Every structure is written in structure tokens, then in C-alpha cells.
Design a protein with these regions (language model features):
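Secretory targeting signals
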Residues: 22-23, 30, 71-82, 87-120, ...
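Aromatic- and glycine-rich beta-strand/loop motifs that create alpha-glucan
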Residues: 27-63
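Hydrophobic/aromatic residues in alpha-helical transmembrane segments
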Residues: 112-119, 132, 167, 200, ...
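Membrane-interacting alpha-helical segments
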Residues: 39, 43, 47-54, 144, ...
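Terminal transmembrane helical anchor/hairpin motif
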Residues: 2-8, 15, 76-95, 217, ...
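Central hydrophobic cores of alpha-helical transmembrane segments
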Residues: 62-67, 213-224
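Short, intrinsically disordered terminal tails adjacent to the first/last structured region
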Residues: 1-34
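Helix-loop-helix units of permease transmembrane domains in multi-pass membrane transporters
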Residues: 121-154
Length: 313
């Protein structure tokens, strides 16, 4: 071989080795001191969290389920459009809107479960295994660790929302020539719902085990779902007690209120006139409830940071 030959070095690090290197770099003082320290450390933590999440089977199972869900939705949408080709355009648009709304409802449930199940052991699992000591004992603020992990999972959930909810909207647009009204508002509300559950799960993960954290979050999500039904039934039958119970459940966990606000933005007139159903919103949550949900998500993240700061490792 000549002296001028070019040597090509192929990287041989596995994903696990790369994650370990990122953690080591994150824990070093130079990683904190170089550049804007807190921002740099948070971004590095988010990258590590994202890569760790990519190794989990549940993430790929959820992605596969999401892809199959989109195939199922496209097949049903195509069959519906084919069978209603002879109907007036306005009737077909109503049908597309109803079908899209049902798909988004199912997609929001999948995204919510994804938020709870993938992050329930992000802190409790590392505390139990002792791997958190490799990071928490370094010159890295604990609240920065929580923020970095939240950012990593939030990025993952953003991609999942784009895959599921964005995929449903894109299929309705290209297959049915139907552009969802208020698309940015609807997408933001659905993302906020997932981010809300993510913050609650992380707050629970600082104190409870992974299984308990997931159970608490999903239990609160179920409470909000049932409370939303009770509130809609109370509004339909003019039962004030049921409406009050629904409002209280929304204050405890505003996830269902976010869905009903999104449903109000996209529901067709025919579905809205049908009365109470999971796909229609008889009693529309106010903008104040959306603001409350945003504050709820922020306070959940702050609570997670405070609890983790006080946790004896």
C-alpha cells in the first residue's frame, strides 16, 4: 500500500456505547462549562434520552402500531369515498370529517398512552438500578437533568404526533381533498395533551416506581375521560351536579378537556347535533381551561424538578 493511501475509519460504536459516551460527556465538568452551560447540558441530556428511548421495544411497537393504524384508516377512508362517490360533495365532506374525527380520537388515546408508558421509568428506573448516580453526582443540576429528559421525550412525542395525527390529516387531505379547519390549533391541543401526561408521569416517577407511576397517570387519564362523559351527559340533560363533577375531574386532570376543545374545532354540524359522544363536544371547554392545562403541564414539570431535587439518592 502506498504512503499516500487514504485510511478510512468506520465507526464501530453501538448505540449503547454511544449513549454511554454521551452520559460521560454530560457528566464531565467541561460539558457544563463550555458554551451556554445549562442550555448545552439540557440539549445533551435530551439527546441521550431520545437515544435511550429509541432502544426500547415499546417505542418501536408503538411506531408499528401507528403505521398499521394509518393503513387501516386509509383503507377505510378509500372504501368510504368509493361507496359515496354518487353523493353530493357536501355530504361526502361531512363523512370525511366524521371519519377523520374518529381517527384523531383514537390517535390521541394512543399518543397519551405512549407518553405515559415510555416515560414512567425515566427517573424511577434509573434510581432503582443506580445508573442515575453516574449523572446526578456530577456537576449537573438535578432540575437540568429533569428538563433534559422531558425535552427528549417531548421531542419523541412530537414525532409521534406528526406520525399519527399528522398522518391522518394528510391522508384526509390527499385522498379525500379535505383540509381540516384550524389544523394548527387542533395539532397544538393534541400535542399539549401528550405533554401534560408526560409531565405528570415524570413527577410521579421521582417518587414512585415505574409501574406505579404509569398506573397513576393512566388512572388520572381514565378519570378525566369518565368525567368528560358525565359532564356532557349533564349538559345534555341539564343536570348541574353531573356538570360540576365533570368540571372537577377536568381540574384534577384536564386531558379530556383538551380533546373536547379540539373536537369542537373540527366537528361537523351533523355530528355536533347528535348530542353527547366521545367524538362530539356538547359542552365546549373555554379558553381559560386551555390556559389552565398549559399551567398544569408547566407546574407538573416544576414539581418533578423539585421532588427530584429533594430525593435522597
Amino acid at each position: 500500500m502506498s504512503e499516500n493511501a487514504i485510511r478510512v475509519q468506520v465507526p464501530t460504536d453501538s448505540l449503547e456505547e454511544q449513549v454511554a459516551k454521551d452520559k460521560a460527556a454530560m457528566g464531565s465538568p467541561s460539558a457544563v462549562l463550555r458554551g451556554p452551560g445549562i442550555l448545552r447540558t439540557t440539549v445533551l441530556l435530551a439527546r441521550v434520552t431520545f437515544r435511550e428511548a429509541a432502544r426500547r421495544k415499546i417505542l418501536w411497537i408503538a411506531a408499528t402500531a401507528g403505521a398499521l393504524f394509518l393503513v387501516l384508516f386509509w383503507t377505510g377512508l378509500h372504501a368510504m369515498l368509493k361507496s359515496t362517490a354518487h353523493l353530493p360533495v357536501i355530504t361526502r365532506r361531512e363523512s370525511i370529517s366524521m371519519m377523520l374525527m374518529m381517527a384523531l380520537y383514537a390517535a390521541s388515546m394512543l399518543t397519551s398512552m405512549m407518553a405515559a408508558l415510555t416515560s414512567c421509568d425515566t427517573l424511577s428506573g434509573e434510581i432503582a438500578s443506580g445508573t442515575i448516580h453516574a449523572i446526578a453526582t456530577k456537576p449537573v443540576r438535578r432540575w437540568c437533568l429533569v428538563l433534559g429528559k422531558w425535552t427528549g421525550f417531548a421531542g419523541m412525542l412530537t414525532l409521534y404526533v406528526l406520525l399519527l395525527e399528522g398522518g391522518c390529516m394528510a391522508l384526509a387531505c390527499f385522498e379525500g381533498r379535505y383540509l381540516l379547519p384550524h389544523i394548527a390549533v387542533v395539532a397544538s391541543l393534541l400535542w399539549l395533551q401528550a405533554a401534560l401526561l408526560l409531565g405528570v408521569t415524570m413527577a410521579c416517577s421521582t417518587t414512585f416506581s415505574a409501574l406505579t407511576s404509569g398506573a397513576i397517570t393512566l388512572g388520572l387519564y381514565g378519570l378525566a375521560f369518565v368525567g368528560g362523559w358525565i359532564e356532557q351527559f349533564g349538559a345534555l340533560r341539564h343536570i348541574k351536579t353531573c356538570v360540576d363533577l365533570g368540571i372537577i375531574s377536568s381540574l384534577v386532570m384536564p386531558s379530556d378537556a383538551l380533546w373536547r376543545r379540539a373536537a369542537f374545532k373540527i366537528q361537523p354540524p351533523l355530528l355536533g347535533a347528535a348530542g353527547a359522544s366521545p367524538f362530539a363536544s356538547t359542552l365546549v371547554p373555554s379558553n381559560a381551561m386551555v390556559v389552565y392545562a398549559v399551567l398544569y403541564a408547566v407546574l407538573a414539570l416544576v414539581l418533578a424538578a423539585i421532588l427530584f431535587e429533594r430525593r435522597d439518592l
